Amino acid sequence: MTVNTDAYLEFVNAVTSQPSKDADAFEYRIQELRGEGFETHRLLTAAVGMSAEAGEFTEVVKKIIFQGKPVNEENMFHLKRELGDLMWYVAQACMGLNISLDEVIEMNVDKLKSRYPGGEFDVHYSENRKEGDLCCLLYTSDAAD
C-alpha cells in the first residue's frame, strides 16, 4: 500500500479543531473557558502531568517485565516516587474541578459497583456497559457531534 503523506496531512488538518491549530482560536477558547469558570490552567497542568508521569511509571514496569530490570529496592522506590508524582497531578485535577480526592474515590467505587453488580470483576460486564455508564455517554455524545 502506498500512502500519499501530503494527502494524509491535509486530511489531518481538515479534521483538527481550530483551537488545536490556530493560536488566536486557542487563546479565544481559553478566555471563553475562563469566563465559564473552567480551571484550564490547573486541568491542563494535571492532564499533561498525569500523562507524562504515567509514562514514566509505565517505563519502569515495562523494563521490569520485558527487559530484565530487577525487582529490587531501588526500582520499587522509583515506582513509588513516580506514583507520588502522579498523585500530585491528581491533586491538581481535584483542585481544578473543586472536588476532594475522597469524592473522586467514592464516585469511582459507585461506578464500579454499578458496573459489576456481583461485586467482582466479570468479563461480560467489562465489555458490555449498561446504559448510562459514562464511557457510553461520552461515546454517544461524541458520535452526535
Language-model regions: role of each:
Residues K62-I65, C94-L101, Y116, E120:
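Long, hydrophobic, amphipathic alpha-helical segments used as structural scaffolds
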Residues D102, E106-L138:
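Short, C-terminally biased terminal segments at protein or domain edges
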Residues Y139-D145:
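Conserved small/polar residues in nucleotide/adenosyl-binding loops
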Residues E39, V71-N72:
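Acidic, serine/threonine- and proline-rich low-complexity regulatory regions
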Residues M1-I65:
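Extended low-complexity intrinsically disordered regions
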Residues A47-T58, E73-N108:
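An amphipathic alpha-helical micro-motif enriched in hydrophobic residues
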Residues I64-P70, F77:
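Catalytic phosphate/metal-binding cores of nucleic-acid and nucleotide-processing enzymes, i.e., regions
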